[in-house]
Amino acid sequence: MRTRAAVALEAGKPLEVMEVNLEGPKAGEVMVEIKATGICHTDEFTLSGADPEGLFPSILGHEGAGVVVEVGPGVTSVKPGNHVIPLYTPECRQCASCLSGKTNLCTAIRATQGQGLMPDGTSRFSMLDGTPIFHYMGCSTFSNYTVLPEIAVAKVREDAPFDKICYIGCGVTTGIGAVINTAKVEIGAKAVVFGLGGIGLNVLQGLRLAGADMIIGVDLNDDKKPMAEHFGMTHFINPKNCENVVQEIVNLTKTPFDQIGGADYSFDCTGNVKVMRDALECTHRGWGQSIIIGVAPAGAEISTRPFQLVTGRVWKGTAFGGARGRTDVPQIVDWYMDGKIEIDPMITHTLSLDDINKGFDLMHAGESIRSVVLY
């Protein structure tokens, strides 16, 4: 069949909206009509050419929601008509990683997904002249129709709006999950969030959901403060307005009963390795945990004095918020529908597919939290 898609023909160039060929689902695969997709910084990272694993031509997009229209042989967990969220981190429930119970990083299709291909080593997309087009993160939601492995779709309730729950496909789950699944923040905790963009806002509301007592936001842009407060931030620090952000946080978290000070948990949402060091060193001696969410540039390295770790601090990383996609994503949709979490204020712009490049422009200008393309 033919479908409209925004194709990344080469690095550093705007996406081109065109008709492409899409082959139907093979065994263990499903075809999904994408109804809405977010535009994420990861898409921009690849399109810019900075992604060492970036492939072209490809159809980007990994933050979508839609309806199953066709299933291949052997598919049992979804059927046509089901509403789903594509998963760039699948959940096969059979590989060593899934069965370990210790990680959400399923390895079932990792090798082919990283090559922009389906599990059988081929692509379902091609140009009208037959030139193959690579898949992206196993999702390719910048196409009106896409084909995914069955293990890479989460079945969700049918009364949830596509234009909001698409954000659960990446940003919402990444931020909230880092709090709930990775850090396991407890009631009454003191926490710091570095970087108050889309991911940071979701970390904030994850902390609010978990019952954190003091929620400190750190950002160089004072304009981020009102929205951050809306999502649960209790204190704001602009590093430009203090001599030493680590000492500022330590002082802010001291109490009459604890003159050591330091956050119980910190979260880096910046991808800046210098900020990652501050995020670790502002945590409490003996038990502080710092969670790295932000993706650093290729080849970047983190550093701190080993003494920081020997004295009880822990550095952790997280991907997709530690969420097991098919199991956890439907629950996060329920949280949204039940009013436990918010998404609507973060969807600042809605666009047509023809205007998709405007979404990247808004991102570059810092004018959007999340732009969503509606099909």
Curated annotation (Swiss-Prot):
It catalyses: a primary alcohol + NAD(+) = an aldehyde + NADH + H(+); a secondary alcohol + NAD(+) = a ketone + NADH + H(+); S-(hydroxymethyl)glutathione + NADP(+) = S-formylglutathione + NADPH + H(+); S-(hydroxymethyl)glutathione + NAD(+) = S-formylglutathione + NADH + H(+). Transmembrane segments: none annotated. Its EC number is 1.1.1.284, 1.1.1.1, 1.1.1.-. One of its GO terms (biological process) is formaldehyde catabolic process. NAD(+) binds at H41, G195, L196, G197, G198, I199, G200, D219, I293, G294, V295, T318, A319, F320. Pfam families: ADH_N (PF08240), ADH_zinc_N (PF00107). Zn(2+) 1 binds at C40, H62, E63, C170. SUPFAM superfamilies: GroES-like, NAD(P)-binding Rossmann-fold domains. Keywords: Metal-binding, NAD, Oxidoreductase, Zinc. Binds 2 Zn(2+) ions per subunit. Its cofactor is Zn(2+). Zn(2+) 2 binds at C92, C95, C98, C106. One of its GO terms (molecular function) is S-(hydroxymethyl)glutathione dehydrogenase (NADP+) activity. One of its GO terms (cellular component) is cytosol. Oxidizes long-chain alcohols and, in the presence of glutathione, is able to oxidize formaldehyde. Also acts as a S-nitroso-glutathione reductase by catalyzing the NADH-dependent reduction of S-nitrosoglutathione, thereby regulating protein S-nitrosylation. Homotetramer. Belongs to the zinc-containing alcohol dehydrogenase family. Class-III subfamily. PANTHER family: ALCOHOL DEHYDROGENASE, ALCOHOL DEHYDROGENASE CLASS-3. This is S-(hydroxymethyl)glutathione dehydrogenase. It comes from Paracoccus denitrificans. The gene is flhA.
